[in-house]
Every structure is written in C-alpha cells, then in structure tokens.
C-alpha cells in the first residue's frame, strides 16, 4: 500500500441503514429508484442497489444496527470503505488509534471493522471480504438504473462543538484524509463551520459540520438525532434534471429555493449555459467559479427524509467543490424551514 494511502482506500462500498420501522426505509429507497436485489437468508437484512450505490437496510435484532436505531432513530449506522486488502487496512487502523468492532455472531457482516462516529461502524471491504457475502439470497443481478443515481459523492458528519478536531484527527491519523475545503457560514440568525475532508484516493469526501450557536440546524440535528452522526448523503447523477423530475414524480420532496436566487444566476455565472427555466422549475442550485475552466456543479437537497437525515442530488460538470456559492442561499432556506416548523424564531 502507498504511504499516502495507508489503508488502500478506493471509495465507498456501501452504506448501511437501520431504524425503528424498516418498512419506511424500504419504501423511501424504493421511491428514490433503488431496487431490493438480495435478502439475507436468516436475518431481516435487505440489499438495495442503484447504479454503483449499495444501501443495506439492517433490521436484525440484538445487534449494532438495532442499538444504533434505538439511540438515534432512523439513519446510517455503518459505512463500508473499499480497500485493496481488508485485513491489512484493519491492522493499520488499529495500530493508528482505531478501536476494533465485532457485531453479534448472528448479525456478523464477515468484515473487519472499527468503531466510528456516534456509535456507527466503518467496515473494510475488498474482493475477498464482502458484506454477508455467503448469506444473500440474490433476487436480481441486473443493473439497476432507477432514477439515474450512480454513486455516493460525499456524506457529512454533524459533530458537537469542540469535536471537529477530534474527528478530523480520526480520519487523518487512520486513513490520511486531508482538509480540502473550509467554510464559515453565517445565516441571518445562526451559523456553522464546515471542514471538508478528502481521502487519498479522492473518492471519499466527508465534510464535518459544527454549530456556532445553540439554534442552528446542526444543533437541531444533534438534539433530534440524540448525538453525532451522518446528516446528509450526496448521490451523483449524470442528468440532474431527469433524476430530480423522476424523484418528484415518486413523491420525494425537495427544499424550496427563493425565486430571487434564479434572478441572480446570470450575474454570478454569466458563462453557465444551463437552461435557466428548467433550473428554476426544478429548484436546482448551480455553482461554479469565475473561470469556466473550473467547471460547474448542479445540486439539490431533499427535505428531511427520515428523522433529521436528508439527501443531496449532485451533478458535477468539472467542478470539485461542494456548492460553496450556494451555501448562503441554502442555509437561509433551511432557516426559513426551521421558522415554519417552529424550531427557530424569526428576528423582527
């Protein structure tokens, strides 16, 4: 393994979800275009696929997934990282501060693993070590196009104030993640700091979010989720207009964006060449730099899908940012949603 990539990382292998009501998770993923392609032979565990994305819904009892759901409600209870050699990656992780994790025997994934944020787990996945590899009844081996979602782009961690350095150090010391972006976002009433980390392979990106006050959406998440964890998951598409239109038809709800946002796009990005009417109709956000060579990014955020967890749909047209130019507009949109829901009082 290369020194700069000590665990031999090569992207996300899967995300695992659990919750008090697994039917809601099944329904939500089906609405998003995922297809159940395998079921565990002995446990209530289902594998959903779309494009290269693998979501496992784990409703087994007396195991880590159930414990995570009892603490946090519905959410992502584990991540699988693709590596060249799962055993070697695990040994490196333990030697650099990782704490080994072992699930109950009946729910064992058959993968080396370490403890991660908020009682979640990171599993190491290679060609020989696949989750529940001999335990699946496979119902479909056909590729799943669904709504055109192709891969996991990034996911965020919401952390307690003062814990950002702790989790940045966790990912740096074990996996050699580096800071690739830093944001200081101020809404009208609340604010947050975000530090985006990137893996040596360039395929795993994890922004860490920390609140600057008691009322922000980060604090609301930590309160409702009963702790730190994965706040949102960004999924790639090659045609965001088609994907979003399809998701809306399936009943997926997205955050509203003020009309004034679209009036400013041509001034912000005069070179963009995107269909403005279509952007506006689907409420898709656009971002880029002054120089067209840095490319464009198109993105949209769902409302909270289960608990305080939501999804982002993202299409990268050469831009590797996170939509920094949209953060302000989005942050204020979420503040308006908080005011509507009564969790934030509007300043008068």
UniProtKB/Swiss-Prot annotation:
Superkingdom of origin organism: Bacteria
Signal peptide interval: none
GO biological process: killing of cells of another organism; tyrosine catabolic process
Cofactor remark from the record: Binds 1 Fe cation per subunit.
Residues of the VOC domain: 11-141, 151-303
Listed EC numbers: 1.13.11.27
Cofactor(s), names only, from the UniProt record: Fe cation
Positions bound to Fe cation: 154, 232, 312
Keywords: Cytolysis, Dioxygenase, Hemolysis, Iron, Metal-binding, Oxidoreductase, Repeat, Toxin, Virulence
A GO term for molecular function: metal ion binding
Keyword Iron among UniProt keywords: yes
Catalytic function, reaction form: 3-(4-hydroxyphenyl)pyruvate + O2 = homogentisate + CO2
Enzyme class: oxidoreductase
General function of this protein: Catalyzes the transformation of p-hydroxyphenylpyruvate into HGA. Has hemolytic and brown pigment production activity.
Protein family: Belongs to the 4HPPD family.
Protein name, entry field: 4-hydroxyphenylpyruvate dioxygenase
Organism expressing this protein natively: Legionella pneumophila (strain Corby)
Gene coding for it: lly
């Amino acid at each position: 393994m290369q020194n700069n990539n000590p665990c031999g990382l090569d992207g996300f292998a899967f995300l695992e979800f659990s919750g008090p009501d697994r039917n809601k998770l099944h329904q939500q993923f089906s609405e998003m275009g995922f297809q159940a392609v395998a079921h565990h032979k002995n446990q209530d565990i289902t594998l959903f696929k779309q494009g290269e994305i693998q979501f496992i819904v784990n409703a087994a009892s007396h195991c880590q997934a159930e414990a995570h759901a009892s603490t946090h409600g519905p959410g992502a209870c584990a991540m699988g990282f693709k590596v060249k050699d799962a055993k070697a990656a695990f040994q490196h992780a333990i030697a650099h501060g990782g704490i080994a994790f072992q699930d109950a025997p009946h729910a064992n994934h058959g993968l080396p693993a370490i403890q991660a944020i908020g009682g979640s787990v990171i599993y190491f996945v290679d060609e020989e070590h696949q989750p529940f590899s001999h335990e699946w009844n496979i119902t479909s081996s056909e590729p799943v196009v669904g709504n055109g979602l192709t891969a996991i782009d990034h996911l965020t961690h919401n952390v307690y104030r003062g814990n950002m350095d702790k989790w940045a150090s966790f990912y740096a010391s074990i996996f050699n993640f580096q800071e690739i972006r830093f944001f200081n976002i101020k809404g009208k009433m609340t604010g947050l700091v975000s530090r985006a980390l990137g893996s040596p392979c360039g395929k795993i990106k994890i922004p860490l979010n920390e609140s600057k006050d008691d009322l922000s959406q980060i604090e609301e998440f930590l309160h409702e989720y009963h702790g730190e964890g994965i706040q949102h998951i960004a999924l790639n598409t090659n045609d965001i207009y088609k994907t979003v239109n399809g998701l809306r038809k399936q009943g997926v709800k997205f955050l509203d964006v003020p009309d004034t946002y679209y009036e400013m796009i041509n001034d912000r990005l005069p070179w963009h060449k995107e269909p403005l009417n279509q952007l506006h109709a689907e409420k898709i956000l656009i971002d880029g730099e002054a120089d067209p060579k840095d490319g464009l990014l198109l993105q949209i955020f769902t409302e909270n899908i289960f608990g305080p967890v939501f999804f982002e749909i993202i299409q990268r047209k050469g831009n590797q940012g996170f939509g920094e130019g949209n953060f302000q507009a989005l942050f204020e949109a979420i503040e308006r949603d908080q005011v509507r829901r009564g969790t934030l009082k509007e300043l008068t």
